[in-house]
Amino acid sequence: PEPATGAFWSPAQLKGPNGLAIAFICNHCPYVVHMIDQWVAIAKKYQEKGIGFVAISANDVEKYPQDAPDAMVTFAQKHGFTFPYLYDETQEVALAYFAACTPDLAVFDAQNKCVYRGQFDGSRPQNDVPVSGQDLALALDALLAHAPPLPNQIPSIGCNIKWKPEKAPSYFIPKPKS
């Protein structure tokens, strides 16, 4: 559901006439905080071009209360979200999309085919590369131009999704405790 409204959304309701961009995010991850304002700017630009946007938080809020639904509402308001910010309490949506980290991005075309799964851009909290959203923007431009998907999609880097113990997927490898 969307904590701000209580509404439940389907992919069909979220998708624009030209596709859908999904970001698995959370409120506390430094990688998300680093890029979120540029993500919002790109969302505004491409929503006008018929691409739907959604952000989804799937973190375990018992262990990470800063990602709880009420904090999500505040985070979305603070950053001027123009799209739903959904809470995946069961973590089933994150599992269905093979989400691994925050931010984790995917773009789907109008026929629901995944045309991009990769990083927002080359900027990281610890480097001097400006936040631009270049990789995502190139993927969205290719989608709108009906061009083939970008051939070299670099995976997202960020904080691991905070899985509930019984939900951790087989593709998740936790850090060893030191």
What does each model-found stretch correspond to?
Residues 1-144, 148-152, 167, 178:
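Chalcogenol-based redox active-site neighborhoods
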Residues 153-177:
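Flexible coil segments in periplasmic/lumen-exposed cytochrome c-class electron-transfer proteins
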